[in-house]
Amino acid sequence: MVSGVTYLKRGAVFGSGAFGTALACVLAKKCESVSVWHMNANEARVVNQKHENVYFLPGAPLPANLTFTADAEECAKGAEIVLFVIPTQFLRGFLQKNSHILRNHVVSRNVPVVMCSKGIERSSLLFPAQILEEFLPNYPIGVIAGPSFAIEVAKGMLTNVCTAAADINMARKIQRIMTTSDGSFRCWATTDVIGCEIASAMKNVLAIASGALKGLGTENNARAALISRGLLEIRDLTLALGGTGEAVFGLPGLGDLLLTCSSELSRNFTVGMKLGQGISLEEIKRTSKAVAEGVATAEPLERLAKKHNADLPICHEVYNVLYANGCAKRSFKKLNSCKLADEGLPALPRTSKM
């Protein structure tokens, strides 16, 4: 049993996709009741009747103390922690419509707010927590990041993630709330918020590259090289944007990158496999219920890298394949034909121990 964890009366989750549902299952172990916001009222009723999110996470029974609702205010009322798991490109629209609910029911009671969405907003090049900060200025916002396939989280399989906040005490507060007493979902605290968000966004793009390698028929050596070099791209952008680098070689960076780049449970990896096999992005979109996050992230990531003069060759080639009529085979040939260089790169700055 894990000591020092915190229990609450009520939790709220905005976003009912696979990961939002999975995190709600975790909260249900820590709260007397949990409410999940789902945009479709009829579907919310079906989920409550079946005790299963048949739309986004079939095969994972939902706890009895977890309910879905299409009423955002009902979801927020009385919550002692609020998680956001709304897709990044739709986050701003939700907040424009519902931020008054957060101010009335969350900010006024100093409730912890945790961003769990991943990606980069196309219009602003902001990360999810930065978008939320525009609507809740000067309010402490946490982030959850790390290797966590939704179905495994929902079924209580062993998972470790990071909780991040600018104030380490807030990160630790969220850590105590989200960590389950049986240790099946365990959190580690950090202050490298931007590092967590960058890693969470970039690993999806890099997973497309890894899947494309698989689709082209390569084996483990090539994937290991891609993961290693991809990790350095995460590091370079993190340092360019002012992160400490603490998250890069931990759970949000290395951990999530290894998971997402190595399993067909990852939608991003699967999209990459299909691209490597010569299937067009249009055909993939047409035959898929949900598009992988990395597809939406690759384009704003390309612009963000240029803005900060960050050299991200692997991510750049993913962008070329997705949006510039590139070919996966030619892209990898180009990457493997680049100018010879030293492996030794500047070390990460030292960070204080947590």
From Swiss-Prot:
> What are the binding positions for NAD(+) in this chain?
G15, S16, G17, A18, F19, G20, F90, K118, A150, R267, E293
- List ligand-binding residues for substrate: K118, R267, N268
**This protein's UniProt keywords:** Glycosome, NAD, Oxidoreductase, Peroxisome
Motif segment (Microbody targeting signal): 352-354
Q: Which GO terms describe its biological process?
A: carbohydrate metabolic process; glycerol-3-phosphate catabolic process
Concerning InterPro entries, the annotation shows: 6-PGluconate_DH-like_C_sf (IPR008927), 6PGD_dom2 (IPR013328), G3P_DH_NAD-dep (IPR006168), G3P_DH_NAD-dep_C (IPR006109), G3P_DH_NAD-dep_euk (IPR017751), G3P_DH_NAD-dep_N (IPR011128), NAD(P)-bd_dom_sf (IPR036291)
EC supergroup of this enzyme? oxidoreductase
Q: Catalytic residues per the record? A: K203
**Compartment(s) of residence:** Glycosome
> Highest taxon of the source?
Eukaryota
Q: Is the keyword Transcription in the record?
A: no
For this UniProt entry, the molecular function terms from Gene Ontology, in alphabetical order, are:
glycerol-3-phosphate dehydrogenase (NAD+) activity; NAD binding; protein homodimerization activity
One GO CC term on file: glycosome
Its EC number is 1.1.1.8
- Which reaction(s) does its UniProt entry say it catalyses? sn-glycerol 3-phosphate + NAD(+) = dihydroxyacetone phosphate + NADH + H(+)
Family per record: Belongs to the NAD-dependent glycerol-3-phosphate dehydrogenase family.
Question: Protein name, please?
Answer: Glycerol-3-phosphate dehydrogenase [NAD(+)], glycosomal
